[in-house]
Structure formats: C-alpha cells, structure tokens
Design a protein with these regions (language model features):
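Conserved thiamine diphosphate
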Residues: 1-136
C-alpha cells in the first residue's frame, strides 16, 4: 500500500486504487493508514487521492475473511463531517469534505461506486477514499 500512496501523491490526477484481499491485508497496512493516510495532510500538507477497497466480511463468509472494521476507520476521521448538511452535499463547495481527512463510503450499487470514483478524479482537491465493499 505504500507504493500506491506514493503514486497517488506524485500523480494526483490519476485514480489510484488499492484493494485488500481476504485476510489481514488491511491490518498489515494499518501503519501506513495511521501515519500517512489519516494524518498526512495535516502533518506534511500533502494531498492524496488514494482509494482503498476493503472487504467488510458481512456477506456470509465470516469475520476471518474480513480486512475491514468499519468502526476503526470512522474513529480515524476528524470532525470535518460534523457540519455536513444536504445543501453542502448538493453544492460544489465541498467545505465539510475539505475539512475532513478522508471519506468513508459503502456503495450499494454500481452507480454509487461510479459516482464516488468520478468525484475522486473530478474534484480540485484530493482526499483519500475508503470504500467498504463485499467480496462477491
């Protein structure tokens, strides 16, 4: 994941995606998530548009096939989303998202995933996106 993080910094206009497979892949990347993804912009003023696809393990295969604990990533978020309203989502200023350190989404269909990826590339600033997915 360190390679993908570095690539997303050097090539900010590309869609850089890292996918954790079954098992403990996200746990091995936790150091990079804590030190670079969650706090990289506040520490070093470096923006990253890295997308992380993490399996949630709630689709019947059991917790041993999960690389994602949703509550862990929600606890890593700062308070930028506290002021999120419907009007701020519909407008183009994205101020609550600019104040947060990353976004966590759980897309329910392919259209939602397309627009989440599209938003990652089309914005004039970069924030990491953590996408909670199933492995089906």
């Amino acid at each position: 994941m360190g390679f993908e993080y570095g690539y997303s910094i050097t090539k900010p206009t590309t869609l850089t995606v890292w996918e954790a497979q079954f098992g403990d892949f996200a746990y091995g990347a936790q150091i990079i998530i804590d030190n670079y993804l969650a706090s990289g912009e506040s520490k070093w003023k470096v923006e990253s548009g890295l997308v992380m696809n993490l399996p949630h393990g709630m689709d019947g295969q059991g917790p041993e096939h999960s690389s994602c604990r949703i509550e862990r990533y929600l606890q890593l978020m700062n308070d930028g989303w506290c002021n999120l309203t419907r009007d701020s989502l519909l407008s183009e200023n994205y101020r609550p998202l600019r104040q947060s350190n990353f976004a966590v989404v759980c897309c329910s269909n392919a259209g939602n995933l397309f627009h989440a990826y599209r938003r990652q590339v089309r914005r004039d600033f970069r924030k990491p996106l953590i996408n909670i997915v199933n492995k089906k």
